[in-house]
């Protein structure tokens, strides 16, 4: 009898042992995740998207490519020192003549974000440094398919700093979106059905598409520097304010994938992988400081392809892996 009573008491006690709350919210997914995030905080809103974890990972890269900068990369740091920067800044209005800054591209089902972030930054900075005289739309595919192991592993991911070093040494040609203009437009079609297979890294072609009048070698655009930006918000702001958008990498969780609007701050959901993007400015919304960022998941994601992420606390590592470069003009 005593044994039975003791067993019953143990069972009752175990039933009231609290679970680890953080571990529980990290495993939330789908609509349950959206409901939790939208009720647990008011900084940003999420919406449910019918997609598998595997499909979400198609757009991301191996986390090692989004890690904080190594000592070797930190040794290249360049810092712009300014007395002050404005409370709000948007590269789209500061350099309104540069159409590329406003452009949202679509990497489709390939972890080519590192190449997109680099191509977008190169496009913007070439325009900025020439005061609008040159407005190339740089080809992510030229980096993705031709940089090879020098940059990383194609659709599995790559190092943003290596993409900029390739720009310096080998040059990069122009190329728009799928079936678009330029020498080498992106060869992977956007996923519109919601059920698309993972894409393979395209093969390197050192020739322009049929009908393009400029030869591949003549279409190259070059950089003169590739460097890291110090890991602090003030240095990143000064770099953008002085020279234009920068490329950054960070860790992605499922609640980011379901972002719809507001200032993102990781709240719940599992870790999915690394991602690279382009930071174009900053501001404050309802008292929350943010970075203004261009994603490469098409215009139907987030705030018409853009998003805001909390600024100043190295949210998801976004302030630990910022790179930039200067165009040869």
Curated annotation (Swiss-Prot):
Name recorded for this polypeptide: Gut-specific cysteine proteinase
UniProt EC number: 3.4.22.-
Family: Belongs to the peptidase C1 family.
Gene label: cpr-1
Summary of the function given for this chain in its UniProt record: Thiol protease. Has a role as a digestive enzyme.
Keyword annotations of the record: Disulfide bond, Hydrolase, Protease, Signal, Thiol protease, Zymogen
Gene Ontology terms: biological process: proteolysis involved in protein catabolic process
Propeptide: 16-84
PANTHER family xrefs: CYSTEINE PROTEASE FAMILY C1-RELATED
CDD domains per UniProt: Peptidase_C1A_CathepsinB
Superkingdom to which the source organism belongs: Eukaryota
GO MF annotation list: cysteine-type endopeptidase activity
Enzyme class name: hydrolase
Annotated active site: 113, 275, 295
Signal peptide coordinates: 1-15
Disulfide bonds: 98-127, 110-155, 146-204, 147-151, 183-208, 191-196
Tissue: Larvae exhibit strong expression in gut cells and weak expression in hypodermal cells. Adults exhibit the reverse: strong expression in hypodermal cells and weaker expression in gut cells.
Protein induction: Activated by a GATA-like transcription factor.
Cellular component GO terms held in the UniProt record: extracellular space; lysosome
Matching PROSITE patterns: THIOL_PROTEASE_ASN, THIOL_PROTEASE_CYS, THIOL_PROTEASE_HIS
């Amino acid at each position: 009898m005593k044994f039975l009573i003791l067993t019953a008491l143990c069972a009752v006690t175990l039933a009231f042992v609290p679970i680890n709350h953080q571990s529980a919210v990290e495993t939330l997914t789908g609509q349950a995740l959206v409901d939790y995030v939208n009720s647990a905080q008011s900084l940003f809103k999420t919406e449910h998207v019918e997609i598998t974890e595997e499909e979400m990972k198609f757009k991301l890269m191996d986390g090692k490519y989004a890690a904080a900068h190594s000592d070797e990369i930190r040794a290249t740091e360049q810092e712009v020192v300014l007395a002050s920067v404005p409370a709000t800044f948007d590269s789209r209005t500061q350099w309104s003549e540069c159409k590329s800054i406003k452009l949202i591209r679509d990497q489709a089902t390939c972890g080519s974000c590192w190449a997109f972030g680099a191509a977008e930054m190169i496009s913007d900075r070439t325009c900025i440094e020439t005061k609008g005289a040159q407005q190339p739309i740089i080809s992510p595919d030229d980096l993705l398919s031709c940089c090879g192991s020098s940059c990383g592993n194609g659709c599995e991911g790559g190092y943003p700093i290596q993409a900029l070093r390739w720009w310096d040494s080998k040059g990069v040609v122009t190329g728009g979106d799928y079936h678009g203009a330029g020498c080498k437009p992106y060869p992977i079609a956007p996923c519109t059905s919601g059920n698309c297979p993972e894409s393979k890294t395209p093969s390197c072609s050192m020739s322009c598409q049929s009908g393009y009048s400029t030869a591949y070698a003549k279409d190259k655009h070059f950089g003169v520097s590739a460097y890291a930006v110090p890991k602090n918000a003030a240095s990143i702001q000064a770099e953008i304010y002085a020279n234009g958008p920068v490329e950054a990498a960070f860790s992605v969780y499922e609640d980011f994938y379901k972002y719809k609007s507001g200032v993102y701050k990781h709240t719940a959901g599992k870790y999915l992988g690394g991602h690279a993007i382009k930071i174009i400015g900053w501001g404050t919304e309802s008292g929350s400081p943010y970075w203004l960022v261009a994603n490469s998941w098409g215009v139907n994601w987030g705030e018409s392809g853009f998003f805001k992420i909390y600024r100043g606390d190295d949210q998801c590592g976004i302030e630990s892996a910022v790179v930039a470069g200067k165009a040869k003009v």
